[in-house]
Regions:
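Extended catalytic cores of very large enzyme megasubunits
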Residues: 1-315
Length: 315
């Protein structure tokens, strides 16, 4: 109802979130995480371990005072004056002026507020009251697990709006709503990467744009902010096929293993989740049998390691 908090009927409580290895050792631990009381521990762990912004949030913020935007919907900016004041009062320049998200309501506000802000900027609402109702309903639905966006939204959306975070451009683009032209993003967070999955093409070329090595760069850019990607590699020539400069190709599989290793080394969104990657290959490709047996060979390695470790224990 108007004037009431979207969390008025929801009880929140503090919990701990611990992720352990199979041997019991702790991978990550967060204490005093505030979440709705009706949430399961699994939901708590996902929010705390994956979706909380864990570093770099300025402790001191101020409204941007953007013209035409209601006070409650104003973007936030880093308040340098307050940060300097805290440092001077503490008589130390080593004062930590950043914090992390520890309350689910901070995340709900970051998401719903950013969505509402952009909607308000582009006249999606007839009145400010409609915008407020939209914001409140989103917060209520997120807290009650009635709706949830994809992971890149949890990772990236609202970091600039809610906390004034900024960073160098990462090679992303957006469509300018006024000119309808594709423009390069000026920074990493004002127009972040909130999309989940991408299908990318790859040419039978080693180093030029659109080629094999360029694909690994593009994939890394997507993985960094929490998205997944997939490609059909059927255009790449098979093992021992001739090259234009002489010699023969090392084959599709050698390059797929490079891409797989690169993806495995990247944590999506800078969290504990690994990158998501899909590889497709047409059935008439010369290397199709090697491709099909790729996973079989990896499973055989695991079986050999398990068998070997059990044998060693018996010795």
């Amino acid at each position: 109802m108007e004037g009431e908090s979207p969390y008025g009927s929801i009880e929140f409580e503090n919990r701990a979130s611990v992720i352990r290895n199979p041997d019991g050792s702790i991978v990550s631990k967060w204490d005093n995480v505030s979440v709705p009381k009706h949430w399961s521990q699994v939901a708590t762990d996902i929010m705390a371990q994956k979706y909380f912004r864990k570093a770099g949030i300025p402790k001191h913020l101020k409204p941007a005072k953007e013209k035409g935007v209601p006070d409650w919907l104003q973007p936030s900016l880093y308040d340098q004056a307050k940060a300097d004041q805290e440092a001077s009062e503490a008589d130390s320049s080593a004062v930590d002026t950043t914090v992390s998200e520890t309350d689910a309501r901070e995340v709900f506000h970051r998401l719903a507020g950013c969505w509402t802000y952009w909607g308000y900027k582009h006249n999606y609402f007839d009145t400010e009251e409609d915008a407020r109702a939209f914001y409140d309903e989103l917060c209520h639905m997120l807290a009650n697990q009635m709706a949830a966006p994809n992971s890149p939204q949890w990772f990236n959306t609202g970091l600039n709006w809610a906390y004034g975070l900024n960073g160098p451009a990462q090679g992303h683009f957006f469509v300018d709503p006024k000119t309808e032209e594709v423009m390069p993003s000026k920074d990493a967070y004002t127009r972040p990467q909130p999309h989940a999955c991408f299908i990318q093409s790859v040419k039978d070329d080693l180093v030029r744009d659109g080629g094999i090595m360029d694909l690994w760069t593009r994939e890394a850019r997507l993985f960094k902010y929490g998205s997944g990607t997939g490609s059909n590699f059927s255009d790449l020539r098979g093992d021992a096929e001739p090259l234009s400069g002489g010699g023969v190709s090392s084959g599709l599989m050698s390059f797929l293993k490079i891409g797989d290793s690169a993806a495995g080394a990247i944590k999506s969104g800078g969290t504990t989740r690994r990158a998501a990657k899909m590889i497709c290959l047409d059935a008439d490709h010369p290397d199709i049998e090697q491709f099909i047996n790729w996973k079989v060979h990896e499973e055989q390695k695991v079986a050999a390691l398990v068998s070997g470790s059990k044998t060693i224990k018996r010795l």
